Amino acid sequence: MTPAPKSSFVLGHRHLLGIEGLSAADISGLLDLSEEYVELNRQVDKKRTSLRGRTQVNLFFEASTRTQSSFEIAGKRLGADVMNMSVSSSSMRKGETLMDTAVTLNAMHPDILVVRHHASGAVELLARKVDGSVINAGDGAHEHPTQALLDALTIRRNKGRIEGLTVAICGDVMHSRVARSNILLLGIMGARVRVVAPSTLLPPGIERMGVEVARDMREGLNGADIVMMLRLQRERMNGSFVPSSQEYFQYFGLDQKKLAYANPDALVMHPGPMNRGVEIDSAVADGAQSLIREQVEMGVAVRMAVLEALARNLPNA
């Protein structure tokens, strides 16, 4: 059994529905606790008992590999009883509403619900109907808070800070919940954020979020410390937003030539899954400046920290 983390941080919120509403102190506290779990997860014995006796339900209405498996591993390492609910075989496939599903699950007294849904705002609605804590694992194009937290942890571990860095977020900003959560978090933590995309993939009024806007990669990557690539979210697109994948890669795909526009020590990130040859070239994704595999490792640590920080607020904790 691994030793308990030294951090006693408690998240002062019942749920984690988004980055919006978190303070810099909340974010720093979660990142500090996550740092401890990074080291604990590298030990042979990774088990903890902080969620022993607690029930964690992973309720995913959208397909997921990284996020769902990461939350499952995180919960089990903390000692929780983890249940993955298959929506394909659930009552919702038979016509039950989201709210009825929430009421039904609540009657089983889960302590923590981890929810992903294709509709923006659906997770917040569900949270109103349950007694336990709810973690948003991604809702439509709205938010994906744990992805932004793991990205922040990855940046902080490699750059030593977040404040003052220039972060270029490139690609399908319009349909990306990852972009929105990262813009919010990086702004709270004092980074300079620039979004880089063709006009068709920029949400109207994005400047109101306090970001700079660039419509070509040379301008967008100039002076960047971090280059964060986003995939084309075709499942959320109604119509054509780019002429073709090949033309998109020509102008907005990250290859070695375009990466040279950024600072020499710039680092590359991607939330996954990647579309190689569309938004990123394999030579960059697998190259020395890539943090993409490290992001996956940080995901487990961050989700353990979030689960523990919320569990410390639960009754009888």
Swiss-Prot record:
Tagged with keyword Disulfide bond: no
Binding positions for carbamoyl phosphate per the UniProt entry: 66-67, 116, 144, 147, 272-273
Swiss-Prot/TrEMBL keywords: Pyrimidine biosynthesis, Transferase
Catalytic activity: carbamoyl phosphate + L-aspartate = N-carbamoyl-L-aspartate + phosphate + H(+)
Pfam families named among the record's database cross-references: OTCace, OTCace_N
Gene Ontology cellular-component terms listed: cytosol
Pathway(s) this gene product operates in, as recorded in its UniProt entry: Pyrimidine metabolism; UMP biosynthesis via de novo pathway; (S)-dihydroorotate from bicarbonate: step 2/3
Residues the entry annotates as binding L-aspartate: 94, 177, 231
GO molecular function: amino acid binding; aspartate carbamoyltransferase activity
Any GO BP: 'de novo' UMP biosynthetic process
Domain of life assignment: Bacteria
Record flagged with keyword Phosphoprotein: no
EC number: 2.1.3.2
InterPro entries attached to this UniProt entry: Asp/Orn_carbamoyltranf_P-bd, Asp/Orn_carbamoylTrfase, Asp/Orn_carbamoylTrfase_sf, Asp_carbamoyltransf, Asp_carbamoyltransf_Asp/Orn-bd
Self-association state and partner proteins as the record states: Heterododecamer (2C3:3R2) of six catalytic PyrB chains organized as two trimers (C3), and six regulatory PyrI chains organized as three dimers (R2).
HAMAP family to which the protein is assigned, alphabetical: Asp_carb_tr (MF_00001)
Membership in a protein family: Belongs to the aspartate/ornithine carbamoyltransferase superfamily. ATCase family.
PANTHER family: ASPARTATE CARBAMOYLTRANSFERASE, ORNITHINE CARBAMOYLTRANSFERASE, MITOCHONDRIAL
Role according to the record: Catalyzes the condensation of carbamoyl phosphate and aspartate to form carbamoyl aspartate and inorganic phosphate, the committed step in the de novo pyrimidine nucleotide biosynthesis pathway.
NCBIfam families in the cross-refs: asp_carb_tr, PRK00856.1
Protein name: Aspartate carbamoyltransferase catalytic subunit
Organism field: Rhodopseudomonas palustris (strain BisA53)
Lineage of producing organism: Bacteria, Pseudomonadati, Pseudomonadota, Alphaproteobacteria, Hyphomicrobiales
Gene this chain is encoded by: pyrB
